[in-house]
Amino acid sequence: MTFLEEVQRRRTFAIISHPDAGKTTLTEKLLLYGGAIHLAGSVKSRKTAKHAVSDWMEIEKQRGISVTSSVLQFDYDGCRVNILDTPGHQDFSEDTYRTLMAADSAVMLIDIAKGVEAQTKKLFAVSKERGIPIFTFVNKIDHFGRSPFDLMEEIENVLGIRTCPMNWPIGINGEYKGVYDREHETIELFAKDETHGQEKLASEKGALTDPRMKELLGDDVYQALLDDIELLDVAGDPFDFDKVRAGELTPMFFGSAMTNFGVKPFLEKFLELAPSPAPRQAVEEMVQPTSEDFSALVFKIQANMDPNHHDRIVFMRICSGKFEKGMSVLHRQSNKTIRLSQPQQFLATERTIVEDAYPGDIIGVFDAGTMGVGDTLCAQKHKVTFGDFPVFPPEFFARVSPKDTMKRKQFQKGMTQLAQEGAVQIFEQPGALDSFVVGAVGMLQFEVLEYRLKNEYGVDLLNNTLPYSVARWIDGEVDIASLKGVDNAMIVKDNRDRTVVLISNEWQMGWVQERNPDVTFLTTPKLHHEL
């Protein structure tokens, strides 16, 4: 296969949703149909004690929530599929944001009973800002749900994107029996699922005009379907490929990830419509995926994927050129040459060594601490720099220190590694030895921090909540002693030695700004390429 053909067959996408919409389950079912796994283990199925393939960290298995982004790959129908499974919990929006920076399209998962929820809105906004195509999968249609017309209206009003249903749920008053495929004018009815969604199912199919289908559905349901089809054809948005690619129209699919219903048709249509790797803006130029000069963007760092070795793996998305095992590349931020040995690809904790990879692919490489999230790797002869990722301002703060002072070294190492991952933001208060101030966007992050330090580094934490909810970065050099009105604030340094003011609330911050008119306070720190 030529280099160009390899690039064109890549599909790299992220799945975004509110917690509990069924994201991890959908990810698993896509892997099931892609042949990457042969038996899907439901997160919630306690009987078999199976855990979702993409939830690999111990705390995720226990709680049934995704707190790290997994990277999963499989081949289907000639396409090489890279799924970026993002954290569903709202406290991990920063990790999710970074993952979306590595995706070429997004699948928005919506619970048919709940519609558009808070986290979906936030993640949708990020996807829209990136200008990537967004596909909608309305999940759980095997349960009682809202009217699909209501959902279409809600998506259009709340998210500001037009919808085009590719299939349509068949039923009356929120009780659905199957789906109608609009393009092929066929009906597919739910099959009775005795395997609880662990295996692929054959379902009952037939043409809309098939008398047997009318008989199976019953007169009332069949007539309701005909009425819905007519209304959709007259009042709905027609399918427009260019609008989908521009992120102005979202193709809608209905199904049930738990029972595998509608997953295969969705996967096939999605792969047909979703884009191959897109050009990416660097500071110097627009980088074309078909360029032969290698470039990659670090979007995630994960410490301790193998708890026995305390390893640190840097995940990068290849943006251009062909990757070959053992190749040497330039790390732009340190200007050092790095040899990329032992590159890996993952199905959760299952690793395979990669010989080569192409634009759109995600690979993980071992790193001793040189690279950071948002860094660029490129060919020596053709230097490019991708822009940094934004930092989400933390809203919760705590001072953490080791209960056992003899574990100071493990504490320092653990905190540094977890901060490099972006799991939390850490700050140091001058003079406060053996402790860090930790900033998070949600309380669950503190729980995960405590859990991981204990389980991965053997450190029990002392955790004291601090009375601050606002962080402001000071732009430029300022004599801290001359700042006015900061008696009740805390002055700290972030991991890049930038000065940060932590203060109790926005009103107090406004007062400090008034007292210091010559000082610029930033909500987020300036990025590398803005300096």
What are these regions (language model features)?
Residues 1-531:
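Structural and coupling elements of P-loop NTPases
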